[in-house]
Structure formats: C-alpha cells, structure tokens
C-alpha cells in the first residue's frame, strides 16, 4: 500500500497541548501519525516556541509568522483569518498534491487561493466562530476589547460562507454539526481528540468542590465569581478554584475568610490531583458552541461532574453529568451529591459511554476514510 500523506495547517503551534483548541489539533495529528499517515504540519506562530517534539513525531513541520500588524484590524475579513495569510505556506503546499486539513476558520483563507483549486481541502471547525466572539464581547469589560470582539463577530458571520468552497467540514460537536449542516453540504461530526487513555476516577468521596479553567479568560473568571458570590455564599461545603493568571478582582474575593480557596497557576500534576480528589468538579459556560475539553478531563479523571446545559451542548455526554442551570439548583445538587459515594458502577458506565463516542482509535479510522 502506497504511503498516505496529509497536510495539516494549524492556527497555532499545537505543542505543548495545554489549551482547548490545540488539544484537538495535536492529538488528532498524533493519532493519524501512529496509523502511518505522513503528516506535513504547518503552524502559524505567535508567542509559542518551535517544538522538537512535533519535529520528531511528524514527517515535516513548518512555521510561519502571523502578521499581527494593526493594519489587519481594518480589513474587511476577520483578523483571525487575515493575520494568517502566508505566501510561503502556499508555495509549500504547491510542491505536491496531497490533501489539506485546515484547522479552524482561522486558516480558511486557503479556500480562496486559486492556485490550490482542485486540491482536496477539508476544514475542521472548532467553533461557530461568530457566536463564540459575540459571547466573548458580552462578558468583556474592557471597552476596546469589547468593540474588537463585536466587530470580529460581525466579520466572521459574513466571512463564514467561504466554507462552502471546502470539500468537507468536520464539526467538533453535534450541536455544531447541526448548525453547519443547515448552511453547507458535506458536514461530518468527528469527536474531539484528547490525551485520555482510560477512565481514572476514584471511588468513594472527596471533601471539596473544584472549579478550574484559564482564569485570565473573562468567561472563566466570571463563572468563578458567580460560584463564590451566588452558590457557595451560604453553603457549608469547601470550594477550590484553580487556574491560570486569576485577575486581581477575582483574587480579592478570596480574602474574606469563607471556606473557599484560590489556587493560582497550578502545574499539570497539581491540577490533575485536584480534579481526581474533588468530590464534585463543577463547570459552567455561557457558550453553546464547540466542545469544552475540560469536561472530558473531569469525566476521565474526576468523580461527580456538575454542569449547566450549555456545557453539554452537542457533546453526547448528557448521561454522565448532573445538570443545574441556576444557583438554587446548583446548591441543591451539591448538597445532595455530598451525601453520595462515587461508585464502581458509575466508573463502568463512564468507560462504556466515553468509549462509544470519544475513542481516539475508532475516530481516527473514520477520519482517515474521510480525509486521506
């Protein structure tokens, strides 16, 4: 059987795979490489270092500088797209006729490149981007950033029709698949790729609730504030909040002596221990689009998982989580769950259900059929 080659164009350098978007990019490319696909990885770089790990894993790795000039903000096309045009990338892609997998709307400018007409070009959609940016605008307090997010959202909504030029769209959630299928042909749901090999949850009980996330992101810091001020304000149950770069306004909430603890900038090992030993991992979001990969982390490694319904949207994980959409329901569910043991039966249920949808081995076989 002849060698199979695939170009993957990534919006960022996907290693270390330590935030939502690049987790799917890296583990998808790794799964393909382990199946013998020769991966030609093309990365736009901005504030991340070149990676020997990637260069050792894949057939070839190329890097391209993002054009982050403020002039890009005044173009009619979205900044996340216009800052990722590269003539060097086009010339590299023209050296052969291998199929091209474009990661996100961010890299979809290549769909408009006439020199690539006739090439198989597939887009992996990571979000419904205009909805994502609109939600970023809603929770942003800085006026300049708020204007930028609203403006980018409007541009993304207009620009999205470029996806009609792709050969196929690979959605990351069922919710996104439903949306894109209403507007475009050839849409397939391919679940997120991830690092988790097995369900590693502990039986028994923990003695705290954990919320974790990148706390420099306004949506996450707002969720943490909501939990402190509205859910745990009168609960006699400990809350730990862990994550990157918590803003001063959030830090100040943890100086009042309540049974709450802020753990800033935990390393991966410390965060994994916090997830594993919590009795409840709680996750809330204002975004319905995409897939929240931290939800998979808590299901593979934690005990009870309490979420709002937006966290589950299109994930096919509803049966494995407890849902509460307001502060009163959350208080009620937390009190109830603290009287329950996490049992082996629950772990077995997770193994079965996660293995059906989020099995990297099965999903990479489907991906190879679609893409290569």
Locate each region found by the language model:
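Donor nucleotide-sugar binding/catalytic pocket of nucleotide-sugar-dependent glycosyltransferases
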Residues: 149-199
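Active-site proximal beta-strand in glycosyltransferases
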Residues: 100, 117-137
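Membrane-proximal helix-turn-helix segments that form the acceptor-binding/catalytic region
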Residues: 88-94, 129-132, 140-169
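Acidic donor-binding loop of glycosyltransferase active sites
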Residues: 275-290, 301-304
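Short hydrophobic beta-strand element within catalytic cores of glycosyltransferases
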Residues: 294-297, 304-308
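Conserved catalytic-core segment of nucleotide-activated headgroup transferases in glycan assembly
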Residues: 189-255, 262-276
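N-terminal subdomain of nucleotide-sugar transferases
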Residues: 1-60, 95
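A charged, aromatic-enriched C-terminal amphipathic alpha-helix characteristic of glycosyltransferases
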Residues: 84, 339-371
């Amino acid at each position: 059987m002849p060698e199979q080659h695939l170009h993957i164009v990534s919006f960022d350098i996907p290693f270390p795979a330590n935030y939502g978007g690049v987790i799917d990019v890296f583990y998808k490319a790794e799964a393909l490489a382990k199946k013998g696909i020769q991966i030609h990885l093309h990365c736009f770089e901005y504030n991340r270092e070149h990676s020997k790990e990637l260069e050792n894993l894949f057939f070839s790795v190329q890097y391209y500088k993002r054009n982050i000039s403020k002039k890009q903000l005044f173009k009619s096309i979205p900044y996340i797209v216009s800052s990722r045009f590269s003539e060097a990338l086009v010339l590299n892609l023209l050296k052969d006729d291998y199929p091209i997998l474009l990661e996100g709307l961010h890299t979809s400018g290549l769909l408009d490149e006439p020199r690539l007409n006739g090439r198989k070009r597939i887009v992996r959609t990571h979000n419904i981007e205009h909805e994502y940016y609109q939600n970023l605008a809603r929770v942003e307090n800085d006026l300049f950033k708020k204007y930028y997010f609203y403006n980018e959202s409007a541009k993304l909504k207009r620009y999205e029709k470029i996806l009609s030029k792709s050969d196929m769209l690979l959605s990351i959630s069922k919710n996104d698949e439903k949306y894109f299928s209403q507007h475009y042909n050839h849409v397939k749901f391919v679940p997120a790729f991830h690092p988790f090999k097995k369900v590693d949850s502990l039986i028994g009980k923990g003695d705290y609730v954990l919320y974790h996330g990148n706390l420099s992101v306004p949506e996450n810091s707002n969720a943490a504030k909501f939990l402190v001020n509205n859910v745990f304000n009168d609960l006699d149950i400990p809350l730990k909040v862990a994550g990157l770069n918590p803003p001063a306004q959030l830090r100040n909430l943890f100086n009042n002596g309540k049974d709450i603890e802020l753990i800033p900038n935990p390393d991966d090992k410390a965060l994994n221990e916090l997830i594993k030993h919590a009795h409840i991992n709680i996750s809330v979001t204002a975004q319905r689009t995409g897939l929240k990969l931290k939800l998979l982390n808590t299901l593979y490694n934690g005990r009870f998982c309490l979420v709002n319904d937006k966290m589950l949207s299109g994930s096919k994980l509803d049966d494995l989580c407890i849902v509460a959409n307001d502060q009163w329901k959350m208080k009620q569910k937390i009190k109830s769950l603290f009287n329950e043991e996490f049992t082996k039966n629950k772990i077995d249920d997770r193994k079965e259900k996660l293995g059906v949808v989020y099995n990297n081995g099965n999903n990479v076989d489907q991906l190879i059929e679609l893409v290569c």
